[in-house]
């Protein structure tokens, strides 16, 4: 058990970071195992509430892949992914929107409010927050040819209107956002939550983007637990993707970090959401954790 002196030392260590990030917007992409394990849910959302109480402006963009997959199984539909993105036909899109907006989003809002924060749930369709066009994914065949794959109602964000989020922040609430966008004809699009978080972070002029995932960060060699890449420069990314060091679902996470950096976000981080209070460890301690992706 920590002594009072050890607890005081922790607070003293955090003070410079509380001052540094006071009044700053920090976008958190909430996903992975941290959305499934009840104690981790509590830890992540408690972190967000604490951040708000010390003067920061946390914004949560959540995923929901496992719960979507489970719901699709219930109705007898298989899940298929291309380049880390879910192939989404019309029926699947209805289920995606139902799960993300109707179930997960409201559950997060309810828990934050119970912990002691004040949260407001939004989807990308509210006030035209995320406007999108159909996205096509480039894939490489076993023969090495590059082809374009049709992945259905998966959208690419064409415009972000952050005013509704800024208004919610200004009124003292924590925005919680489901990554569903609206198309030119009013159709719904499934947006990868990593991309949504990156684009929103840039549009808000956020100081930091944090992406929670189910690994320690980006590993140079996944068979070697000691090969964590603590700092990754943008110029190194294409080579790591080509070599397969960055692949699958990690590709959109890294790409969204690069997009956010290009849009003016100061720092981006990929953290292990399985570690309790990983967000606080990154923000309020000298060492930090995970992989920082920088220009």
Swiss-Prot record:
EC id: 2.7.2.8
Keywords: Amino-acid biosynthesis, Arginine biosynthesis, ATP-binding, Cytoplasm, Kinase, Nucleotide-binding, Transferase
GO BP field: arginine biosynthetic process via ornithine; L-arginine biosynthetic process
Pathway field: Amino-acid biosynthesis; L-arginine biosynthesis; N(2)-acetyl-L-ornithine from L-glutamate: step 2/4
Subcellular location: Cytoplasm
Reaction catalysis annotation: N-acetyl-L-glutamate + ATP = N-acetyl-L-glutamyl 5-phosphate + ADP
InterPro entries: AceGlu_kinase-like_sf, AcgluKinase_fam, ArgB, Asp/Glu/Uridylate_kinase, Glu/AcGlu_kinase, NAGK-C
Molecular function as annotated in GO: acetylglutamate kinase activity; ATP binding
Binding of substrate, residues: 64-65, 86, 190
Cellular compartments per GO CC: cytoplasm
Site entry: Transition state stabilizer: 29, 253
CDD domains: AAK_NAGK-C (cd04250)
Family in the record: Belongs to the acetylglutamate kinase family. ArgB subfamily.
Cited NCBIfam families: argB
Functional summary from the UniProt entry: Catalyzes the ATP-dependent phosphorylation of N-acetyl-L-glutamate.
Protein's UniProt name: Acetylglutamate kinase
Organism: Pelotomaculum thermopropionicum (strain DSM 13744 / JCM 10971 / SI)
Protein encoded by which gene: argB
């Amino acid at each position: 058990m920590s002594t009072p002196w050890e607890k005081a030392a922790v607070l003293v260590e955090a003070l410079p970071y509380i001052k540094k990030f006071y009044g700053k917007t920090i976008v958190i992409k909430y996903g992975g195992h941290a959305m499934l394990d009840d104690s981790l849910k509590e830890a992540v959302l408690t972190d967000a509430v604490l951040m708000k109480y010390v003067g920061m402006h946390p914004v949560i963009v959540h995923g929901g892949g496992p719960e979507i997959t489970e719901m699709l199984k219930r109705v007898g539909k298989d899940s298929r992914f291309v380049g880390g993105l879910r192939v989404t036909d019309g029926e699947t899109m209805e289920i995606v929107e139902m799960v993300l907006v109707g179930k997960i989003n409201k559950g997060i809002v309810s828990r934050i409010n119970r912990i002691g924060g004040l949260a407001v749930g939004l989807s990308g369709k509210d006030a035209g927050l995320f406007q999108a066009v159909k996205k096509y994914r480039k894939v490489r065949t076993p023969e090495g040819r590059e082809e374009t794959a049709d992945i259905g109602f998966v959208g690419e964000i064409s415009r972000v209107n952050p005013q509704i989020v800024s208004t919610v922040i200004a009124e003292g609430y924590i925005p919680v956002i489901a990554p569903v966008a609206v198309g030119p004809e009013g159709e719904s699009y499934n947006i990868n939550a990593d991309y949504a978080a990156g684009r929103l972070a840039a549009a808000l002029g956020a100081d930091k983007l944090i992406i929670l995932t189910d690994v320690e960060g980006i590993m140079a060699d996944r068979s070697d637990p000691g090969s964590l890449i603590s700092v990754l420069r943008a110029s190194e990314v294409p080579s790591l993707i080509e070599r397969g060091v960055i692949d699958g679902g990690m590709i959109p996470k890294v790409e969204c970090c690069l997009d956010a950096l290009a849009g003016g976000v100061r720092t981006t981080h990929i953290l292990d959401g399985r570690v309790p209070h990983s967000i606080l460890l990154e923000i309020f301690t000298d060492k930090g954790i995970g992989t920082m992706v920088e220009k």
